[in-house]
Amino acid sequence: MLRFQRGTVKESSSAKLASTSRNGPESSILDPHHSVMELLQRQMEGSEVPSESGVLGESWQQIRESDVGDGGDSNFDQQSNTSAILSSSSEASEDEDLDIQQQLLGGQQEYKNFHMTAEEQLQEQAQGQGFGRPSLLKGTQSRLSEQDSNRSGSVRTIVDKGSCSSSLDEHELNSIFTSDSMSLTKSTGSSSTSFVMPKLSLTYKPSQAKKLLVVGRLSKRFHQDIPREYRQYFHISQSSDPSEFQNYIGIVIVFQELKEFVAMLNRIVQYTDKKPIIPICQPGQRIRVKNILKSFLKNDAITLWYPPVTIANEKSMEKLFKHTVKLVNKLENEEDVLSLSTSDKSLSDETSGYRKNNRRKKHGGKPSTNYSKWITWGISLTIGVSIGYYATYMITTTLLYGKAESHHANEAKGFSITNGNSGSSSISHSTEYYESTISQKGLLRNTIVFIKRTIHNLNGKVGTFFASITQVIKQTPVREDNQFYTLGYMLS
């Protein structure tokens, strides 16, 4: 493997040198690398190495813009070749490995000389070889200082010709760009053209067909008091032409007197087809405004966007604005915005739904205090009267049964004494009556007897009532299909 690499390097270097000798002074950017390769090859073959290389200096001066190619972005092939030589030589003997390493170390010393900056090389060539070009050295130094000063604000552009097959190391590429005048620079700071950032507007502004028209004497004041995030949904008309009413999705009437409100309603009914409205009234006018709206709604002349709102109530106004934004965003998805037939329907549905929810919240959240008081008082009175009646009944029944028992006992004793000659029949009669009264002494038994008698009497009365009703139905000429409905009517 070592011999194969040596032969390959030797053939490539000899071919490059032959092409250089034939072409004369014209050379490429890879000539310095081939010079280093030639030096390494001579050391490995044992030939004499010149103290100074004139080919390196001449080839460095002959670098042109057309010689820069694709090889500027990858690593130098010489490093891979040397690493391959080192790895392959480990398989050979130790003596051969040491000799090769010594030769490579000598070649690397010459390779380091290649990484010298252009300024150092020019100074060495001017002093050692006597080129006699002080003006060239001076011009090169001035170019280097100028490029170093503009390096931070410049953009380097490399012309890609695709004519080079090898690659340069990144350090070598940087030295070339900073040392010669081949790099094409364009300073962004000195450029006459400048990029202007356009102003971007992120605010959403709905079209006129999706806005609410504010009318009335206090319309300007009302529009100024609207928060900024909701102000874009409202518009003030510059003219008092009622024909503009049809161009808006709804009308907000801000009034101070009821006469003005009625006049605006008449104009809306005359020039529009049930345009949705929002009445904004003053404190104390809400009930009368509702009565006026009821008369218009009964005739199906207008559509109510939102219930009347007092201008001084901030919470109600905030709810109105949120409700308006919600409906406008909902109507944006409709295909035909100007034809408000479907829009009016959706608005009426939303308004009715809002009213129902409002009523549910009012009834569910705050129950009537009078209603709860009446229920409490009724239940307490019923329980109290029932307990009192039950206690009174039990006490009175106990007393009555006690008196009756004592009275019947005395009568039985007297009857048995006075009528002692009557025999066993009178005694047995008094004994049976006494036992019957004793069986009724218990409080629980008395209660059960009372309940049974009450139920029996109630059943008798209910049965008599239904019997009279059925008798009346039979006597009246009613069809059999309608007898059930007639019975229900009579019961109600």
UniProtKB/Swiss-Prot annotation:
Residues 342-351 have a biased composition (Low complexity). The chain crosses the membrane at residues 374-390. Coiled coil: none annotated. Residues 356-365 have a biased composition (Basic residues). GO terms for cellular component: mitochondrial outer membrane; phagophore assembly site membrane; vacuolar membrane. It is found in: Mitochondrion outer membrane; Vacuole membrane; Preautophagosomal structure membrane. It comes from the Eukaryota. Signal peptide: none annotated. It is a single-pass membrane protein. Residues 1-97, 122-157, 342-368 are annotated as: Disordered. GO terms for biological process: autophagy. Keywords: Autophagy, Membrane, Mitochondrion, Mitochondrion outer membrane, Transmembrane, Transmembrane helix, Vacuole. Residues 10-26 have a biased composition (Polar residues). Mitophagy-specific receptor that recruits the autophagic machinery to mitochondria and regulates selective degradation of mitochondria. Mitophagy contributes to regulate mitochondrial quantity and quality by eliminating the mitochondria to a basal level to fulfill cellular energy requirements and preventing excess ROS production. Recruits ATG11 to the surface of mitochondria. Also promotes autophagy-dependent peroxisome degradation. Belongs to the ATG32 family. This is Autophagy-related protein 32. It comes from Candida glabrata (strain ATCC 2001 / BCRC 20586 / JCM 3761 / NBRC 0622 / NRRL Y-65 / CBS 138) (Yeast).
